[in-house]
């Protein structure tokens, strides 16, 4: 069986804000991560865990803060890209932002917002070609001709996010960082946007890094999931492994915090409390494979216990 192609490969990444200053903050601490072609890799964790920082680092937005490690895109270190290679990478890797209102220019019409990438990269030669491509993109995300000349404030939150998705797809990317793309949306339309992203992924063979707080939605859309806390990835596995067979205490704590819609079971639910200081014991920890494809940040002794429990 052919091994799947790695689109993104992060090796021992360290990233520090305000390095050398009193308020230095090590946002990413020795993180390694692979994202394969055509998959959706979900990244979950509490606010401040470093999820968005990883996504922005992949897109070269935080190059000045990286203090160690590598970020490879199709085998090339993105920090070394220059000239035509950098221009090509800007097209191949795109981002869908968390707040559809703030990420769209309120003074621009939809057709010009979506066409920004086309214009900047010289992907269309005539106005007719430009208009046809913009209309194709709007239809792809469930909008129509009537929306071309409207402004962002004339749309609902879900429609604005669809415009943001169309803009990201305009340059035909291979990889998309979706930074909490549904958290600012009404619950009633979150599933619509996620289903739209899945449909587009199948049509365009896209690879997603899906960053979110909503654990149930991450489970629904993701092939594999990584759990982050304090700048480290603590557990990586398939959606089924992480949700149905969590191993790391923090993952168990995170999942136990999900409220139940049943009021009786909700009253009986006992959340698991995670003590992060338990890992500040000076012992060396690294990502270790517990079951095939299921990795946990642990010491060698902890890994042996996890493996034994996994076979019970």
Curated annotation (Swiss-Prot):
Instruction: Please give the name of this protein.
Output: Dipeptide transport ATP-binding protein DppF
**What's this protein's function?**
Part of the ABC transporter DppABCDF involved in dipeptide transport. Responsible for energy coupling to the transport system.
Q: Where primarily located?
A: membrane
Query: Which residues are connected by disulfide bridges in this protein?
Result: none
Q: Which organism is it from?
A: Lactococcus lactis subsp. cremoris (strain MG1363)
Name of encoding gene: dppF
Superkingdom of origin? Bacteria
- Gene null: resulting phenotype: Inactivation of the gene impairs growth on low concentrations of di-valine.
Q: Where in the cell is it found?
A: Cell membrane
Give the matching PANTHER family: D,D-DIPEPTIDE TRANSPORT ATP-BINDING PROTEIN DDPF-RELATED, TRANSPORT ATP-BINDING PROTEIN
Q: How does it sit in the membrane?
A: Peripheral membrane protein
Q: What is the lineage of its organism?
A: Bacteria, Bacillati, Bacillota, Bacilli, Lactobacillales
The reaction(s) annotated as catalysed by this protein in its Swiss-Prot or TrEMBL entry are: a dipeptide(out) + ATP + H2O = a dipeptide(in) + ADP + phosphate + H(+)
Any matching Pfam family? ABC_tran
The family annotation for this protein states: Belongs to the ABC transporter superfamily.
Enzyme Commission designation: 7.4.2.9
Name the enzyme group at the top EC level.
Answer: translocase
Please provide the record's keywords in A-Z order.
ATP-binding, Cell membrane, Membrane, Nucleotide-binding, Peptide transport, Protein transport, Translocase, Transport
- Span of domain ABC transporter: 10-255
Q: How does it assemble?
A: The complex is composed of two ATP-binding proteins (DppD and DppF), two transmembrane proteins (DppB and DppC) and a solute-binding protein (DppA).
Under SMART domains, the record lists: AAA (SM00382)
Record-listed ATP binding positions? 45-52
> A GO molecular-function term, please?
ATP hydrolysis activity
């Amino acid at each position: 069986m052919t091994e799947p192609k790695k689109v993104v490969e992060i090796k021992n990444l360290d990233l520090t804000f305000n390095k050398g200053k009193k308020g230095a903050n090590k946002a990413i601490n020795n993180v390694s991560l692979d994202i394969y072609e055509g998959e959706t890799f979900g990244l979950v964790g509490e606010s401040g865990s470093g999820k968005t920082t990883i996504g922005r680092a992949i897109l070269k937005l935080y190059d000045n803060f990286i203090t160690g490690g590598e970020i490879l895109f199709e085998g090339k270190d993105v920090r070394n890209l220059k000239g035509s290679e950098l221009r090509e990478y800007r097209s191949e890797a795109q981002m869908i932002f968390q707040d559809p209102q703030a990420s769209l220019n309120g003074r621009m019409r939809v057709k010009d917002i979506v066409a920004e990438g086309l214009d900047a990269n010289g992907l269309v030669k005539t106005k007719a070609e430009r208009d046809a491509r913009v209309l194709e993109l709007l239809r792809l995300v469930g909008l129509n001709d009537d929306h071309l000349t409207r402004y962002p404030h004339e749309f609902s939150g879900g429609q604005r996010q669809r415009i943001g998705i169309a803009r990201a797809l305009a340059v035909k990317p291979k990889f998309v960082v979706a930074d909490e793309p549904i958290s600012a949306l009404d619950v009633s339309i979150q599933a619509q946007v996620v289903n739209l992203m899945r449909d587009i992924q199948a049509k365009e063979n896209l690879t997603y890094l899906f960053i979110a707080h909503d654990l149930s939605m991450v489970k629904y859309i993701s092939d594999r999931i990584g759990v982050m806390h304090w700048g480290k990835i603590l557990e990586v596995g398939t959606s089924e492994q992480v949700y149905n067979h969590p191993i790391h205490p923090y993952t168990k704590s995170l999942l136990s915090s999900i409220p139940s819609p049943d009021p009786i079971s909700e009253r009986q639910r006992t959340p698991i409390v995670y003590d992060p200081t338990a890992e500040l014991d000076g012992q060396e920890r690294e990502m270790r494979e517990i079951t095939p494809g299921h990795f946990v940040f642990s010491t060698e002794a902890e890994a042996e216990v996890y493996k034994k429990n996994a076979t019970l």
